[in-house]
Amino acid sequence: MSDEKKPEAETSESLQKREEKLAETLASEPAAQGEAEDAAAAGPDVAALEAEISDLRNRLLRAAADMENNRKRAEREKQDAQRYAAANFARDMLEVSDNLRRAIATLKEDERAEAAESVKAMIEGVEMTDRQLVTIFERHGIREITPQPGERFDPNLHEAMFEVPGTDQPAGTVVHVLGAGYMIGDRLLRAARVGVAKADDGAAKGGKVDTIA
């Protein structure tokens, strides 16, 4: 009789186990679904964060580039300020050099040769002073530009003080040099003062000289 009841007990146990497995499966499905939903919801957030990080990185790079450009510009402005700070003073000193040269130029060679020793010493002192001025100018980046007769007038470097007719030269040719010009760095400190050839009436050589830079 015990043998007849044994299959029934096994059948009950089997059904119970199946019910337990089914309950576990049903219980795990909402959790898995929730995890999937959480992952799907987190996806857009990750993409947004990556986009924000990329934007911040680009802003940082642009800011660094702007800072470097500002530093270079400030350095250039500092160098220009140092180089050209004394431009007005140097321009005034050029007049002193001009006056020294005019004083020397008024003496003819024979007059200088016949002058007393004291006068010769004074002339030599004036010449030495002018040479010292030129040396000081060069030390501070100031260089002389002296056009030669026959050169073409350059409105960027020369100042035409007058025109000379009847020179048989093309209009705009430098025929007289009244004073040297000077550059400071790459800028014009003072234009060279010149006289230029004037076009003859009806002449085909050249035309009216352009005296405006």
Curated annotation (Swiss-Prot):
- Gene for this protein? grpE
Recorded superkingdom: Bacteria
Localization recorded for this chain is: Cytoplasm
Q: Name one GO molecular function term.
A: unfolded protein binding
Extract one GO cellular component term from the record: cytoplasm
- Tell me which Pfam families the record gives: GrpE
* Annotated Low complexity bias: 29-43
Q: Does the keyword Chaperone apply?
A: yes
Keywords, A to Z, come to:
Chaperone, Cytoplasm, Stress response
Region annotation Disordered: where it falls in the sequence: 1-43
Biological function: Participates actively in the response to hyperosmotic and heat shock by preventing the aggregation of stress-denatured proteins, in association with DnaK and GrpE. It is the nucleotide exchange factor for DnaK and may function as a thermosensor. Unfolded proteins bind initially to DnaJ; upon interaction with the DnaJ-bound protein, DnaK hydrolyzes its bound ATP, resulting in the formation of a stable complex. GrpE releases ADP from DnaK; ATP binding to DnaK triggers the release of the substrate protein, thus completing the reaction cycle.
Compositionally biased, Basic and acidic residues: which spans?
Answer: 1-23
What is the name listed in the Swiss-Prot or TrEMBL entry for this protein?
A: Protein GrpE
The biological processes this protein is annotated with in GO are: protein folding
